Amino acid sequence: MSKSLKPWALVTGAGGFIGHHLVSYLKANGYRVRGVDIKLPEYSSTDADEFLLLDLRELKNCQTCTARMDLVYHLAADMGGIGYITASHAGIAHNNSLMNLYMLEASRRNDVGRFLFSSSACVYPHGLQTSPDVTPLREEDAFPAQPEEGYGLEKLYAEKLCQYYMEDYSLYTRVVRFHNVYGPLGTYDGGREKAPAAMCRKVACAQSPGGIEVWGDGKQTRSFMYIDDCVEGIHRIMRSDYRNPLNLGTDELVSVDELAEIVIGVSGKKIALMHDLTKPQGVRGRNSDNTRLRSVLHWEPQITLRKGIVPTYSWIAAQTVNATPGAIVAAE
């Protein structure tokens, strides 16, 4: 690391949901932070010491932002909810592959101390996620490989790139597999939002009594992690000595209908669920096995879904005053 008393950390995707929160967390924990994105944060000003507006699909921009950095948290990605990622395979694979390769190469050239890559539970084989009563997914379950098309495949490819850069160039890499992150200051409309944000928006916009549309039959299951747990977990994993991919999520498995009922309960409204079976709903079940996370970090996410939905719903409801309801998307 540099000789500065405070190490420099770069957060890519700092204009996005997780990146914006991570910048604030790192600043609160004594780091100097450079953020980079193609856009500024949408809902709140950044806490970063520096913020660069750069397109990371160009190597020269990746070299610029990684210069003099001790740590790189690479969160930048072309992503969205189930509707977006199932309809945009080529664009997602193209954009993310360029960013991931160029960020690794630039970090190597600039002698970055450690590089953390944000992967996804979408790397896990579809065949292990065919039942709502899914067995929690272990890190080793990613192989033999059968990831989700597009987004999941490029994430798994980037995980291997991280491994190769560590083996061949001694770039110390860390890989985090996120499981459905939610919270305030995240995208809640436009098609790129995840299920908790979309559900909060729909309920907030609905009349009481009234109804909301849910994609699929509502029986598909997921676990959801609150943003505060997410950024703490990212920081802990970066500081750890563990070099292989790690799940980062809760193991509190709920159905999409149960998620809806939690949001409705927090809202205090009387709302019925109407299911649209023609819409994409993703895999039938997905849950995080946190056995290795607990073993490595002696820690795991602590915030329950209901506790996290309270501030999330409150924030989204405040954003959607006079808004028109849209469709609920399925979970990732």
Residue ranges and their predicted role:
Residues 45-48, 127-131, 186-190, 227, ...:
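Short aromatic-enriched loop/helix-cap "lid" or pocket-rim segments at secondary-structure transitions
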Residues 157, 161, 165, 195-199, ...:
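Hydrophobic alpha-helix immediately C-terminal to the catalytic Tyr-X-X-X-Lys motif of short-chain
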Residues 205-332:
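C-terminal substrate-binding subdomain of Rossmann-fold SDR/epimerase-dehydratase oxidoreductases
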Residues 1-184, 311, 319, 330-332:
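N-terminal Rossmann-like NAD(P)+-binding domain of SDR-like oxidoreductases, especially those catalyzing
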Residues 12, 93-97, 151-152, 189, ...:
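Short, solvent-exposed loop/helix junctions and linker helices
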Residues 19, 100, 178, 196, ...:
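Alpha-helical structural signal
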Residues 103, 162, 199, 293-294:
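Structural element of the ATP-grasp superfamily
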